UniProtKB/Swiss-Prot annotation:
<dbReference type="InterPro" id="IPR015422">
    <property type="entry name" value="PyrdxlP-dep_Trfase_small"/>
</dbReference>
<comment type="similarity">
    <text>Belongs to the class-V pyridoxal-phosphate-dependent aminotransferase family. PhnW subfamily.</text>
</comment>
<dbReference type="InterPro" id="IPR000192">
    <property type="entry name" value="Aminotrans_V_dom"/>
</dbReference>
<keyword id="KW-0808">Transferase</keyword>
<dbReference type="GO" id="GO:0047304">
    <property type="term" value="F:2-aminoethylphosphonate-pyruvate transaminase activity"/>
</dbReference>
<protein>
    <recommendedName>
        <fullName>2-aminoethylphosphonate--pyruvate transaminase</fullName>
        <ecNumber>2.6.1.37</ecNumber>
    </recommendedName>
</protein>
<feature type="modified residue" description="N6-(pyridoxal phosphate)lysine">
    <location>
        <position position="194"/>
    </location>
</feature>
<dbReference type="InterPro" id="IPR012703">
    <property type="entry name" value="NH2EtPonate_pyrv_transaminase"/>
</dbReference>
<keyword id="KW-0663">Pyridoxal phosphate</keyword>
<dbReference type="InterPro" id="IPR024169">
    <property type="entry name" value="SP_NH2Trfase/AEP_transaminase"/>
</dbReference>
<dbReference type="InterPro" id="IPR015424">
    <property type="entry name" value="PyrdxlP-dep_Trfase"/>
</dbReference>
<dbReference type="InterPro" id="IPR015421">
    <property type="entry name" value="PyrdxlP-dep_Trfase_major"/>
</dbReference>
<dbReference type="Pfam" id="PF00266">
    <property type="entry name" value="Aminotran_5"/>
</dbReference>
<dbReference type="GO" id="GO:0019700">
    <property type="term" value="P:organic phosphonate catabolic process"/>
</dbReference>
<comment type="function">
    <text>Involved in phosphonate degradation.</text>
</comment>
<keyword id="KW-0032">Aminotransferase</keyword>
<keyword id="KW-0670">Pyruvate</keyword>
Amino acid sequence: MTENHYLLLTPGPLTTTKTVKEVMLYDWCTWDVEYNMMVQKVRAKLVSLATKEEEKYTTVLMQGSGTFSVEAVIGSVIPKNGKLLVCTNGAYGKRIVQMAEMLHIDVVVSQTEEWEPTNIVEVEKILQQDKEITHIAVVHCETTTGIINPIVDVCKLGKQYGKVTLVDAMSSFGGIEIDIAELEIDFLISSANKCIQGVPGFGFVIAQRDELLKCKGQARSLSLDLYDQWETMENQNGKWRFTSPTHVVHAFYQALLELEKEGGVRARYNRYYNNQKLLVNRMGEIGFKPLVNEKYQSPIITSFIYPEGNFEFQQLYNELKRYGFVIYPGKISKVDTFRIGNIGDVHEEDINRLVDSIAKGVVIG
């Protein structure tokens, strides 16, 4: 197998190991007992990554991108008379709002600037004033900028006011330690192609069992029915309702084994954290400043402000691609930025090579 032609410095899809890619060379039948046993192992491993209180939680795998799993939760968990509070400071919080509106779910928004974390004082004020709210949703790592939101405080408030808590941990789960039982998270959503370092093709929901049982018959979609998907997997030993991405599941299982071999979530977090600190320090040396305040910055992806002078992102992008790197454009409207991810099979030597390449290709001032 050939090596990667580019190093993806993006928040997912990301650079995977050669061994993760190699397992996709084999074909699997969706009805095969061995394959379905692998699905069950994946489900169990995800719960064990999420909490020590494993008996309280279960995992549902859902075909499609991570957004499909988020929409499965929004469309299945909130009853017809429910009301959703969404904390948003970026594109992915806004997407949850859009889902709720499309599904005719009553929704209220707590919005902050994209470079500022969720405002806990405002969230509590909304919860105090609006007694009809039944559910609260927050994005843990908002990859629009790379900011980390205070899910501990949001979930604590949610439970203080008796709400069901939904956390989009798409770009953080597996890379930042989270105990969903301690945080009283009822539904956590993530994806195969993020910090666990698999490839795109399915998302997953780690759900509090008692809350999941309440979802029966509530779904607003056939294919995105979270309860029915879970019930089939439970009763038919890992069977999916509809065709599953067999190669992707096998790659994800391999990625889970490699996460364990690396030393678990804490070890992976340390690698990502060191990558991010090195990136910011080295970029600072050549004139680039991060958008997000250091105390709110995630170890997942960093937004850099365009420097003053004759700077063109597309030129930088093309130059870096020539050197073997792919980065992300910015995603906010008020400040010109670009983004560099440091998750995936990325190490400090890769960050150093990247910044050396940027220094060669960019003239600032």
